[in-house]
Amino acid sequence: MSAERVDRFELQFEYFQKSLARLKEALAEDETSFVRDSIIKRFEVTFEMAWKTMFRFLVDKGERIAPKAWDVIPVAFQSLLIPEAAPWDKMREYRNDTSHEYNESRAVEISAFVRSDAVFAFDRLQAEMLNRT
């Protein structure tokens, strides 16, 4: 790996870790509509940082993939960066939903998913990245 690529991965991984920490700050609060909106926004950012971190890691390992979440997630699964693709596919779906419209019942659903599944998947990715670097 070139020094530039290593630096780009390390920087992207740092962004992911920081965004995950900020997401957890929001999750620690009692949920109100304001906190729910914060959770969703921080989820959006963390998801973006997560798949971009996986992309940087995989490219640095020689994978040739497009820089798009729907291309990165299957390769990350095949490379065992993530143990399951299903939660990541759901995260991608929710991320797309939050970008295009606001629906209160959907926001409650997404927030619950972030609490129950997404943060666990993010934690597992972080642990795997720390283990591999």
Regions found by a protein language model. Give the residues of each.
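Solvent-exposed interaction patches of small proteins and small membrane subunits
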Residues: 1-133
